[in-house]
């Protein structure tokens, strides 16, 4: 994934990615570079434009990402409900704290 991300950074900078540029990005990020992986990346991406790769990736994300928003929505709803319960409990505890003794008035 790091190698593909480095490739994407070079492409987004406006340059046509080459092995040396991808290696430079990886080196700047502190990644231990394996030349065989760089070679494999360029073999896999040979003949494909960056725009084509992005379009292909988006179509894959759309197909598999439909369940994620529902899970996030239910988590957000649970967090709101938990916060409301905590607030209610806190106000009940505060009401119990003042029993009318007036010791510190």
Curated annotation (Swiss-Prot):
Q: How is it modified after translation?
A: Phosphorylated.
Sorted alphabetically, the Gene Ontology cellular component annotations on this record are: cytosolic large ribosomal subunit
According to the UniProt entry, its GO molecular function terms are: structural constituent of ribosome
CDD domains reported for this sequence: Ribosomal_P2
Q: Which UniProt keywords apply?
A: Phosphoprotein, Ribonucleoprotein, Ribosomal protein
* Record-linked Pfam families: Ribosomal_60s (PF00428)
Keyword Oxidoreductase tagged:
no
User: Which Gene Ontology BP annotations are present?
Assistant: cytoplasmic translational elongation
Asked if the Swiss-Prot or TrEMBL record annotates the protein with the keyword Ligase, the reply is no
Please, which domain of life does this record's source organism belong to?
Eukaryota
What the protein does comes down to: Plays an important role in the elongation step of protein synthesis.
Q: How does this chain assemble?
A: P1 and P2 exist as dimers at the large ribosomal subunit.
| Family (UniProt) | Belongs to the eukaryotic ribosomal protein P1/P2 family.
Q: What is this protein called?
A: Large ribosomal subunit protein P2
What is the protein's species of origin?
Answer: Leishmania braziliensis
């Amino acid at each position: 994934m790091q190698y593909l991300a480095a490739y994407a950074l070079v492409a987004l900078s406006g340059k046509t990615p080459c092995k040396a540029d991808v290696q430079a990005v990886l080196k700047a990020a502190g990644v231990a570079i394996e030349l065989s992986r760089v070679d494999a990346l360029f073999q896999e991406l040979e003949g494909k434009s960056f725009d084509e790769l992005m379009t292909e990736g988006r179509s894959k994300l759309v197909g598999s990402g439909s369940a994620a928003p529902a899970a996030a929505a239910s988590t957000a709803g649970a967090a709101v409900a938990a916060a409301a319960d905590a607030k209610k409990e806190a106000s009940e505890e505060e009401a119990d704290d003042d029993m009318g003794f007036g010791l510190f008035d």
